[in-house]
Amino acid sequence: MRILVLEDDRVQQGRIEQTLLDIGRSRNLRLEIDIAKNYGDVEKYSQYFDNYQLYLLDLEIDGERERGFQVAQQVRERDPFTSIVFVSTHSEALPLAFRYHLSALDFISKDQSEEDYRHQLERCLDYVLAVSYTHLRAHETVLD
């Protein structure tokens, strides 16, 4: 599974990457994780938007509070069905996701316990795997 993380805080970058890698190891999953540290990095990775199955986006990037929503809009323009999860301390901004019509899979608060944080990430990975498997099976059925 290919994942793009948008996070500008180094501590949080390490936290999310390590948690994902731990989950991947415990479940024998092959995870390819790219980390965009700022909006400029997102532009660099945007040519590969079609290749990611999951986006984990912080809301506030480079001091701009809605930057994560703007990135999610760009992703949606290229792929209306991919999974987007917001990972942030700004839970009060979550209603804005509806204004942007982003169909986010989840919102993960950075302020929760490590156990809850990991559990939410696991549930998101499980969902993406299930959807990918369903699409693969549907594709195989069409080919048969």
Report the location of each language-model feature:
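Non-catalytic signal-transmission and effector/linker regions of two-component phosphorelay proteins
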Residues: 1-2
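Short hydrophobic/Thr-rich beta-strand motif most characteristic of the beta2 strand and flanking loop
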Residues: 25-39
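Charged phosphotransfer/docking patches of two-component systems
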Residues: 10-17, 94
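CheY-like receiver
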Residues: 52-129
